Amino acid sequence: MIQPQTYLNVADNSGARKLMCIRVLGAGNSRYGFIGDKIIAVVKDATPNMAVKKSDVVEAVIVRTRHHIRRDSGMTIRFDDNAAVIINKDGNPRGTRVFGPVARELRDKNFTKIVSLAPEVL
């Protein structure tokens, strides 16, 4: 459950390390974002000399949440951290690598490029 003011780790090599959510997109009028939802975020911590700088406003997709996900099979899954991948306007990731596992629900929401870059899909 990601809401405005939530801090997230960045799961790619775009140059940002920490994001703060400022708006949840694509969730209707809901206050919370879940895996596969797009968010507008501000970069709070970044690696020097990279494409993404501190205080940049970026669009990202949530790939991991500490809040559990219930699947149709009855299984629940949760991750150790809240994480997002920075994307461009076309929905493609700005980085060239994705770190850590991502949820299978991203494939259903047409983020296949992120799923293909991830080392593990749960």
UniProtKB/Swiss-Prot annotation:
Instruction: Report whether S-adenosyl-L-methionine shows up as a keyword of the record.
Output: no
Function as written in the Swiss-Prot or TrEMBL entry? Binds to 23S rRNA. Forms part of two intersubunit bridges in the 70S ribosome.
Q: Which organism is it from?
A: Nostoc sp. (strain PCC 7120 / SAG 25.82 / UTEX 2576)
InterPro entries named in the record: Ribosomal_uL14, Ribosomal_uL14_bac-type, Ribosomal_uL14_CS, Ribosomal_uL14_sf
Determine if rRNA-binding is one of this entry's keywords.
yes
One Gene Ontology term, aspect cellular component: cytosolic large ribosomal subunit
On assembly, the entry states: Part of the 50S ribosomal subunit. Forms a cluster with proteins L3 and L19. In the 70S ribosome, L14 and L19 interact and together make contacts with the 16S rRNA in bridges B5 and B8.
What's the name of its gene?
rplN
Question: Keywords of this protein's UniProt record, alphabetized?
Answer: Ribonucleoprotein, Ribosomal protein, RNA-binding, rRNA-binding
GO MF entry, a single one: structural constituent of ribosome
Family the entry assigns: Belongs to the universal ribosomal protein uL14 family.
Name-wise, this protein is Large ribosomal subunit protein uL14
Name any Gene Ontology BP term.
translation
